[in-house]
Swiss-Prot record:
Name of the encoding gene: VMA11
Compartments where located: Vacuole membrane
GO molecular function, one term: proton-transporting ATPase activity, rotational mechanism
Top-rank taxon, per record: Eukaryota
Species assigned in the record: Candida glabrata (strain ATCC 2001 / BCRC 20586 / JCM 3761 / NBRC 0622 / NRRL Y-65 / CBS 138) (Yeast)
Protein name: V-type proton ATPase subunit c'
Annotated family: Belongs to the V-ATPase proteolipid subunit family.
Membrane-side (Cytoplasmic) residue stretches: 38-59, 120-136
Amino acid sequence: MDMVASDNVYAPLYAPFFGFAGCALAMILSCLGAAIGTAKSGIGIAGIGTFKPELIMKSLIPVVMSGILAIYGLVVAVLIAGNLSPTEEYTLFNGFMHLSCGLCVGFACLSSGYAIGIVGDVGVRKYMHQPRLFVGIVLILIFSEVLGLYGMIIALILNTKGSE
């Protein structure tokens, strides 16, 4: 009996679909979180720009932090894509593991971007009236950013499980 690659129960032909889905979801959801954070905090920055233009540069911190979220998704997507090859056998375990990596970093960055956007918008508006709030706002932004970092760390740990 001739064995074909698709006859392997542990590496069916549809297994790479889950890996590609994980790669795509890591980028899509992370960039969506970055876009939400940038848009929401950008509204606040545009609002204070007409009253106090000198505060705009200090108020860009939420936008920069939101952009970093997309980098988290990019790192995980590149690692997942590096494990995909048309010539090597790809198991269903690796497919599900890569899907969970993408979902983990994607949803973590999505929620982080939403939090950064809300804190950035309200924080920038209140900072215009009370400059002493700056340190507190930055601390809250850091805690919001760390949510996305946690998702990336878990995705990296999961990704190493497939390489063993």
